[in-house]
Amino acid sequence: MKILLVNPDVPLTFWSFKKALKFISKKAVLPPLGLLTVAAILPREWETKLIDMTTTKLRDRDLRWADYVFVTAMVIQRKSVDQVIERCRKIGTKVVAGGPLFTSLPEEYVHVDHLVLKEAELTLPLFVRDLQKGCPRKVYNTHEKADLHQTPIPLWNLIKMKKYAMMCIQYSRGCPFDCDFCDVTTLFGHRIRMKTTNQVLAELESLYALGWRDEVFFVDDNFIGNKIHLKKELLPAIIAWMKKRQYPFSFNTQASINLADDDELMKLMVQAGFDCVFIGIETPNQESLSECNKLQNIGRDLVACVKTIQRSGMQVQAGFILGFDSDKSSIFDNLIHFIQQSGVVTAMVGLLNAPRGTKLYNRLMTENRLSIAATGDNTDFSINFVPKMGIDNLLKGYHKVVSTIYSPRNYHERVLTFLRNYRPGKNNKPRYRYCDIKAFLKSIWHLGIIGKDKLSYWKLIFWSLKRPQYLHLAVTLAICGLHFRSIFESYSHA
């Protein structure tokens, strides 16, 4: 059996970093972890190939080679995956589809040969069994949740690692919280399901053995969902593993704001090699936090929480949302002030959207306020419902926020605000490779010579040269800022 696994292309988005990746000669940020795991579940005697369209062109002869084409997609990849499915139909190659898009919208993909929905550890073996018997069903679904103790190590040999900025692994699925706009719990539930410590170490070892010596992203939606297991087992084991191998990786992940409450956990994460964490802050407006059931953020000094995490040794990236029913016209200036004051450099500010299956979606449907389908990109100036403040006021205010915080002067000043408060871990020493030196020189040209606000760039660089431990990060963030500006400029012009 010949299986071709295809990861559809991703459009130019906030998290694609396409403009920034050119500075370090990379094609994509992350490899398709889901497909690499699916490949590991398939029978060993089957011949498998993987084409990641974010790094490699998909040719018709690749599709003709395969007996089956396995595709996955998030909502944001919908346009690309639809084109792949149509190409397969014309060529006559059967398609097996799974992943978040197809699990959320199976009724819109009845034309696909086989739908293997929910978590692959449960439904894929059933499809394989029936396929080997010659009687595969149209749809495979389940209401159960997978036991991650059975999840295999991804087949890294199917990709070329050098094309990616970082590798990724998964430790857990699920989130204990219940934000009404989030579909994570719809897909994975509230109970935190974890891999064993030995599994995580084995995955790290597999990357290490293949020569990877760079950043690794823990893709968990909330890495700190089970703090006790982290502090007692996983993090101490990673610390020992990293020390024995002279700290080959740095880590980043996603977590909730209550990380700031736990000094011990932050200390262990930094000792293990974590230097960055993404947190859903959403809004400084307490009424809006209550509206969306973001209970873990209510009643806090959110700026102080961010600065606590920064001082512990981790950069805080954060998501923010505009368009809540409780938002007033003052929210735009308040959000700008919050982002600048907190030193959240990578601030993903998006418009509220209601994904299918969420409590927000169901409420808006009841109120007859849904409009178009969500695009999966909440920074593209689209919104799939009628906002209470009016769409024109919301879009005008949104444009003001992103154009202000990503102007070169405000952005570079925010980098300085962060770096002045940041205390990197003692093992978090930047690695200067040829691509890093080349990226620095490119940044001088694009930002320091032909850039829109050269003075603020040079202010950042000269400050960092006096504090060389920050130079690598300062240059990296400056380059990322160029990407962020290009994203919002392209959307606003459109």
Walk through the language-model features, giving the residues of each.
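Acidic, low-complexity intrinsically disordered segments
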Residues: 1-212
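Phosphate/oxyanion-binding loops and surfaces in catalytic or ligand/nucleic-acid-binding neighborhoods
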Residues: 45, 91, 127-134, 151-154, ...
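Radical SAM [4Fe-4S] cluster-binding motif and immediate context
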Residues: 150-317, 324-337, 365, 373
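Flexible glycine/acidic-rich beta-alpha junction loops that bind and position SAM and/or redox cofactors
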Residues: 10-17, 104-107, 220, 226-228, ...
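A C-terminal junction/extension of Radical SAM enzymes
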Residues: 51-55, 145-151, 315, 327-350, ...
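Structural recognition of alpha->loop->beta junctions
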Residues: 107-126, 268-276, 336-349
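Conserved beta-strand positions
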Residues: 5, 71, 218-220, 279, ...
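Radical SAM enzyme core and accessory elements
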Residues: 2-5, 12, 47, 62, ...
